[in-house]
C-alpha cells in the first residue's frame, strides 16, 4: 500500500512540474501588454515588462523569440544590470537612453547550470531608461548603432 501511495505522489509531482514548465515556457506571454519599438528603420513588436515580477522573469524559460519581436523594459534613468538566469537562447540587449541607443550587449549566451552568484552580469551605460531584448545578432544584422534613433510606438503604454 505504501508503494502505491508513494508512486501516486511521485506521479502527481511529476505532472505538476510538467504543467508548470509548460505554462512558464509558452511564448509570447498573453498576460503582457504589447507595443512597438522602432530603431532607425527597424520595427519590433514587443512585450512590455511593466511589473517587478515581469521584469525579473523577462524571457526566462522561453525557448525562442520570433524574428522582429522582443521584450521592452522601462526604468528610471540609471545603470541597468541584466543576467541570463534561466534563459534558453542567446539575445542582444539594447540599452536605450531617452530616444537614442546608448549601447548594447551582443550575443549574450545562456549559462545553464551556472550558480546565480557566478552568472555574467551585463551592465548598461549610465542614464539608460529602457532595455530592449531581441534575438542574438539583431544589432549587427539590422545595423543598430549607438546614437540610432528610438521611437516607442503609439499605443505602447507602460
Task: State what each model feature region is.
Residues 1-12:
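N-terminal Sec-pathway targeting helices
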Residues 2, 16-158:
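Compact, glycine-rich, soluble single-domain proteins
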Amino acid at each position: 500500500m505504501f508503494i502505491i501511495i508513494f508512486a501516486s505522489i511521485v506521479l502527481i509531482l511529476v505532472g505538476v512540474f510538467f504543467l508548470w514548465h509548460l505554462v512558464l515556457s509558452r511564448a509570447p506571454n498573453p498576460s503582457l501588454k504589447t507595443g512597438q519599438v522602432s530603431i532607425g528603420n527597424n520595427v519590433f513588436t514587443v512585450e512590455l515588462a511593466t511589473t517587478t515580477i515581469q521584469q525579473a522573469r523577462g524571457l526566462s524559460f522561453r525557448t525562442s523569440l520570433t524574428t522582429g519581436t522582443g521584450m521592452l523594459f522601462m526604468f528610471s534613468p540609471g545603470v541597468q544590470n541584466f543576467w541570463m538566469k534561466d534563459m534558453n537562447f542567446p539575445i542582444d540587449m539594447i540599452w536605450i537612453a531617452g530616444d537614442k541607443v546608448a549601447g548594447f550587449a551582443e550575443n549574450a549566451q545562456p549559462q545553464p547550470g551556472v550558480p546565480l552568484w557566478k552568472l555574467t552580469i551585463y551592465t548598461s551605460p549610465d542614464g539608460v531608461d529602457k532595455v530592449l531584448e531581441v534575438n542574438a545578432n539583431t544589432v549587427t544584422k539590422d545595423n543598430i548603432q549607438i546614437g540610432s534613433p528610438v521611437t516607442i510606438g503609439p499605443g505602447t503604454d507602460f
